[in-house]
Regions:
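The conserved cystathionine-beta-synthase
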Residues: 297-335, 340-356
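A short, proline-enriched helix->beta-strand linker immediately N-terminal to the Walker B motif
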Residues: 189-193
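Conserved ABC ATPase "signature" region
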Residues: 32-42, 99-100, 141, 148-165
Length: 356
């Protein structure tokens, strides 16, 4: 199979109306859902089938870290396994790198997984009888690459995750965090465009988890990987994700930036999820500022000497600036032009969660 052809503007991943119903009567249940609008409890009662995911749709652009989160049983792990067809959907369309995943032959699907898709699980399933070097190079061995090539790539990937010097160790000689890094290096070895990560750091201690999050974010940016990252930890999703999808009972209930999710929850379920999350690092000046024309029309204040701050300045930084001046803060665009104003009243409303 030749490499999928895409432009930089095309979505790397597209899901459109994807359903998964588990059970012997899944097709019959699917027809009933479509024709009668049955819900998850009715499907279980009438057909003895379980709705895993329900009408999931989203797109992921190139280079984005798209986090999917929800409680246990919400369908997030089931959903991510549809992207490489470890699980077959009952209905819907799945496109990855411009290829219709459901139309691929067995050989094409194996090539797609081996070359273009990398997956990292919570439990790495490293081969215990192989060294770290050979574990990392295993995907290349499956592709038939010679040992010299495998070792060269393994060395490079181990350096990326700061494990150079551990090439000849065995998994049992490594800590849990180090084993996770071996798993990430293994996923990177085939240089896939897409990474599918299913709670890869959730079993680790908080300090190690944070270190691996930092390392992963840096690698993702440097290598321009497109990632679907599954987690049950909202703090992790907010820290890592460019956008977040929240799932409940197999459905996606909201998709948005971390700021959107925290400040504009779609329903009570999302609101309960984000309760207690600090907004100080998630809400930015452009979201709460008063537009410059509107401010000048109502306030006769000379802003020429006011402190300037970029539109991407977060609440925490705005608070620091406010403590150093009695004047409003003028917000600027990417070119340095004045576009808005934040006074102390506006800042307090932003901290409380309101808009100017």
């Amino acid at each position: 199979m030749s490499s999928p052809s895409q432009t930089a503007e095309d979505p790397v991943i597209e899901l459109d109306g994807v359903w998964k119903i588990f059970g012997d009567r899944a097709d019959e249940a699917m027809r009933a859902v479509q024709n009668e609008g049955l819900g998850k409890p009715e499907v279980l009662e009438k057909f003895a089938c379980v709705v895993g995911i329900a009408d999931c749709s989203f797109t992921v652009p190139r280079g984005e870290i798209f986090c999917v989160m929800g409680l246990s049983g919400s369908g997030k792990s089931t959903m991510v396994r549809h992207l490489n067809r470890l699980i077959e959907p009952t209905a819907g369309r799945i496109s990855v790198l411009g290829r219709d995943m459901l139309s691929l032959s067995g050989e094409e699907l194996r090539t797609m997984r081996a070359v273009h898709l990398g997956m990292v699980f919570q439990h790495m399933a490293l081969l215990p009888h192989r060294t770290v070097r050979d574990n990392v190079g295993f995907p290349l061995q499956v592709r038939g690459e010679p040992k010299s090539k495998r070792w060269e790539v393994s060395q490079h990937c181990l350096e990326l995750v700061n494990l150079d010097g551990y090439e000849d160790r065995f998994p049992r000689e490594l800590s849990g965090g180090m084993q996770q890094r071996v798993g990430l290096a293994r996923a990177l070895a085939s240089d896939p465009e897409v990474l599918l990560m299913d709670e890869p750091f959730s079993a680790l201690d908080p300090l190690i988890r944070r270190q691996l999050q930092d390392q992963f974010m840096a690698l993702s940016a440097d290598l321009n990987k497109t990632t679907v990252f599954i987690t049950h930890d909202l703090d992790e999703a907010i820290r890592i994700g460019n956008r977040i999808a929240i799932m409940k009972d197999g459905r996606i209930v909201q998709i948005g930036t971390p700021e959107d999710i925290v400040t504009k929850p779609a329903d009570d379920y999302v609101r309960d999820f984000v309760e207690g999350i600090s907004k100080l690092k998630l809400v930015f000046a452009h979201s709460i500022m008063i537009p410059l024309d509107q401010y000048q029309a109502s306030q006769k204040i000379d802003l020429s000497a006011a402190t300037r701050a970029p539109h991407g300045t977060d609440l925490d930084q705005l608070i620091d600036i406010t403590t150093t001046t009695d004047h409003p803060i003028v917000i600027t665009d990417d070119d340095g032009g004045d576009i808005g104003v934040i006074d102390k009243t506006t800042l307090l409303k932003g901290i409380q969660g309101g808009k100017a």
